[in-house]
């Protein structure tokens, strides 16, 4: 049986951490792609030399040509630039939209059968653009946001209650940004919903509101502390969790930026919702019941994402049309 192949587009902090985690978990052989000559090759060599120490047998390589990702089973995209001081939203969109065009065309040509996870920001708009430029099926292209945001929410709740993070379940709906919607009503500690824990005196609504706001500001908090960078360990771990669910057909229920067309009253959009990820990619959209307040917050988040997508269409009108459906490569015998 042929080993799986994982292609990482972008050799920065997240890309390098993704490669290490893929190696440690032995999910498959890894190729790191980056336009900077020597960078992906150097990181791949360093990580390959880590194998004998850590005890993994993953083959790692670097590439500066999209041919290197040929036949990949999973592609994780981190390429692009972060938002810098003085940079407008449209500036960031313009730069990363061009990157998504190049990446999407590369995936369509060399890895049309892949399951694609996008991590590039602004996430919800970039995963939409990547799907448009690649022409891959909607169920095979997803954005990593909710797993990370939910992980942050779970950590803050576990710290508040003094319990293990393993006993805390929580998820976040909506876009990856200020308008994300953490849902206390659907979040639990050992099966006990957060509103009940408030009634039991474990915390207060005011403290819970602060935790929710801290979750929304999770990325900015890390940027403020680092000063010269942004989060990369947790984003990489989140991306690997999604890739592993696909490669091992785990049927994991994970919050992701997925394509919805009618669910939640939203049409033709990528936005954060709980989904089932298995060998078929996104196999099901989990449509939970939202009360009036939750629905209002969710639609506010959807509208914020729509604003980003509309801005992308103005910057590059061709993205609205999208690419022709990617031609699937012949299956290996």
Swiss-Prot record:
EC number(s) reported in the record: 1.1.1.37
SUPFAM superfamilies in UniProt: LDH C-terminal domain-like, NAD(P)-binding Rossmann-fold domains
Primary enzyme class: oxidoreductase
InterPro entries according to UniProt: L-lactate/malate_DH, Lactate/malate_DH_C, Lactate/malate_DH_N, Lactate_DH/Glyco_Ohase_4_C, Malate_DH_type3, NAD(P)-bd_dom_sf
Catalytic activity as recorded in UniProt: (S)-malate + NAD(+) = oxaloacetate + NADH + H(+)
Active site residues per record: 176
Tagged with keyword Oxidoreductase: yes
Molecular-function annotations in GO: L-lactate dehydrogenase activity; L-malate dehydrogenase (NAD+) activity
Residues that, per the record, bind NAD(+): 10-15, 34, 96, 119-121
Role this protein plays: Catalyzes the reversible oxidation of malate to oxaloacetate.
HAMAP family: Malate_dehydrog_3 (MF_00487)
Family membership noted in the UniProt record: Belongs to the LDH/MDH superfamily. MDH type 3 family.
Protein name as catalogued: Malate dehydrogenase
Species the sequence originates in: Parvibaculum lavamentivorans (strain DS-1 / DSM 13023 / NCIMB 13966)
